[in-house]
């Protein structure tokens, strides 16, 4: 049974435009009211950027499959569910037409200054994939069984204490952080909301040294976070809607056909048994 669903629970810290105060909101609330928030306002900017990329992944996935009205593009075949599963991708011959339609979608949503309801419909259809704690699909994680089955016998994955995940503390087991904002056992105490934010941050910035080591003959390789590898830059708008939409790239500006027509494959749509 899953616990702490990120679609429903309040875990993303935002800065309100009207009051200038911060509050925690759920994924669904954020997309429904993005224009009411000034910006993401987590513990630090590197965390905000990591979470921003998850939000952009949702928007890119949805609006490369359907337009601003929630209708599938005529060059792509989707299943009949709100999951918007791609059954047949865009043929390269229609790349120009598809790109033009993506441009129209971007303009339509920008002018409306709000995200269409199809975003939340899509997320709700994948509700079971957004549990932070779950036996089958823990968000941004793999299950213990999924990991152990791929490791050499007797080997385990790296263990992380809360004080290591929380980069406001960043304390290892053999070196104490003297000036940490909390002390003693409190260093490893985290709420589910904090855990969700720092987990996404860790996955974005982690290097290979802290990853589980796979056997040499395995197909899996140690991987580092994209943000650790390439860094990043983004445009900031007057509110969170503008920031999100200005950074949503529905097609490649350099006429990269492969980028434009290849279906997005976010981690929450992944089926562990098919890896």
Residue spans of the language-model regions?
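Conserved small-residue
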Residues: 1-275
């Amino acid at each position: 049974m899953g616990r702490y669903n990120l679609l429903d629970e309040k875990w993303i810290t935002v800065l309100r435009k009207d009051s200038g105060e911060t509050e925690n909101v759920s994924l669904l609330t954020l997309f429904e009211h993005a224009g009411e928030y000034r910006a993401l306002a987590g513990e630090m900017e590197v965390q905000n950027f990591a979470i921003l990329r998850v939000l952009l992944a949702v928007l890119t996935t949805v609006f490369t499959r359907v337009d601003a009205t929630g209708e599938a593009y005529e060059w792509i075949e989707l299943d009949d569910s709100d999951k918007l599963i791609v059954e047949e991708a865009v043929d390269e011959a229609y790349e120009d037409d598809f790109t033009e339609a993506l441009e129209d979608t971007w303009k339509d949503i920008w002018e409306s200054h709000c995200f269409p309801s199809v975003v939340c419909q899509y997320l709700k259809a994948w509700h079971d994939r957004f549990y932070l704690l779950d036996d089958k699909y823990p968000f941004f994680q793999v299950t213990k069984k999924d990991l152990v089955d791929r490791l050499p016998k007797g080997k385990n994955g790296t263990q992380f204490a809360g004080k290591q995940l929380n980069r406001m503390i960043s304390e290892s087991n053999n070196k104490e952080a003297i000036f940490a904002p909390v002390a003693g056992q409190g260093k490893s105490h985290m709420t589910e909301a904090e855990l969700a934010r720092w987990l996404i941050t860790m996955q974005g910035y982690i290097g290979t040294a802290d990853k589980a080591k796979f056997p040499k003959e395995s197909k899996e390789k140690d991987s580092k976070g994209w943000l650790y590898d390439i860094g990043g830059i983004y445009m900031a708008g007057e509110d969170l809607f503008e920031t999100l939409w200005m950074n949503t790239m529905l097609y490649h500006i350099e006429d990269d056909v492969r980028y434009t027509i290849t279906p997005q494959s976010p981690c929450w749509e992944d089926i562990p048994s098919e890896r």
